[in-house]
């Protein structure tokens, strides 16, 4: 898999389809043939085999192909407005969010907000959250009381790639994990 191709697809399908003249539908889908043509016209060589390889080999399953293989979209992480069409689902009692310790103070004061994305991303396990936090510096894992949030009327969605999504997490539902190491996974 080409990392450059994966980054290009993430940029175009999550954040800037207009950068190559691509149009996403309301659920974030793009026509594969149109994507390939516009990628090549913009100077990014891409064929169908290469595209399918990136989709198949992405360890984080960032992209989803439609059942007929004619459309593609990012599984989650959009900054452009899309409705992934996922129904709200009941989450597990706890979810996890990984971040860097330097971001901890404002998070504990204001809660988790989506920032430039449409929704907050949460993990079902501590190990994944820890890996996410390590990308940004010294990691810390936050435990989200998802069960109580759900009971209080907050909605959760499960993306195609297993990432949990919600609009925001108020600080009152957050606890700092006493041990942010992977071996304490729940």
UniProtKB/Swiss-Prot annotation:
Species this chain originates from: Agrobacterium fabrum (strain C58 / ATCC 33970) (Agrobacterium tumefaciens (strain C58))
Functional description taken from the UniProt entry: Removes the 2'-phosphate from RNA via an intermediate in which the phosphate is ADP-ribosylated by NAD followed by a presumed transesterification to release the RNA and generate ADP-ribose 1''-2''-cyclic phosphate (APPR>P). May function as an ADP-ribosylase.
Recorded family membership: Belongs to the KptA/TPT1 family.
Keyword Lyase among UniProt keywords: no
Annotated protein name in UniProt: Probable RNA 2'-phosphotransferase
GO MF annotation: an example: tRNA 2'-phosphotransferase activity
GO BP terms, alphabetized: tRNA splicing, via endonucleolytic cleavage and ligation
EC number(s) recorded for this UniProt protein: 2.7.1.-
UniProt keyword list: NAD, Transferase
Superkingdom, natural source: Bacteria
Organism classification: Bacteria, Pseudomonadati, Pseudomonadota, Alphaproteobacteria, Hyphomicrobiales
Signal peptide: none
InterPro entries named among the record's database cross-references: Ptrans_KptA/Tpt1 (IPR002745), RNA_2'-PTrans_C (IPR042081), RNA_2'-PTrans_KptA (IPR022928), RNA_2'-PTrans_N (IPR042080)
Keyword NAD: yes
Pfam families named among the record's database cross-references: PTS_2-RNA
């Amino acid at each position: 898999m080409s990392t450059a191709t994966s980054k290009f697809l993430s940029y175009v399908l999550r954040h800037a389809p207009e950068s190559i003249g691509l149009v996403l539908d309301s659920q974030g889908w793009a026509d594969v043939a149109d994507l390939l043509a516009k990628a090549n016209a913009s100077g990014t060589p891409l064929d169908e085999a290469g595209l399918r390889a990136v989709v198949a080999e992405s360890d984080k399953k960032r992209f989803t192909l439609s059942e007929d293989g004619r459309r593609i979209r990012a599984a989650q992480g959009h900054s452009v407005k899309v409705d992934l069409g996922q129904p709200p689902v009941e989450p597990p009692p706890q979810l996890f969010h990984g971040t860097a310790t330097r971001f901890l103070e404002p998070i504990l004061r204001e809660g988790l907000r989506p920032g430039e994305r449409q929704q907050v991303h949460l993990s079902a396990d501590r190990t994944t959250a820890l890996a996410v936090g390590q990308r940004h510096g010294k990691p810390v894992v936050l435990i989200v009381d998802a069960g109580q949030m759900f009971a209080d009327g907050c909605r959760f969605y499960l993306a195609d790639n297993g990432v949990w999504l919600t609009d925001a997490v108020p600080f009152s539902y957050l606890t700092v994990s006493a041990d942010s190491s992977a071996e304490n996974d729940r």
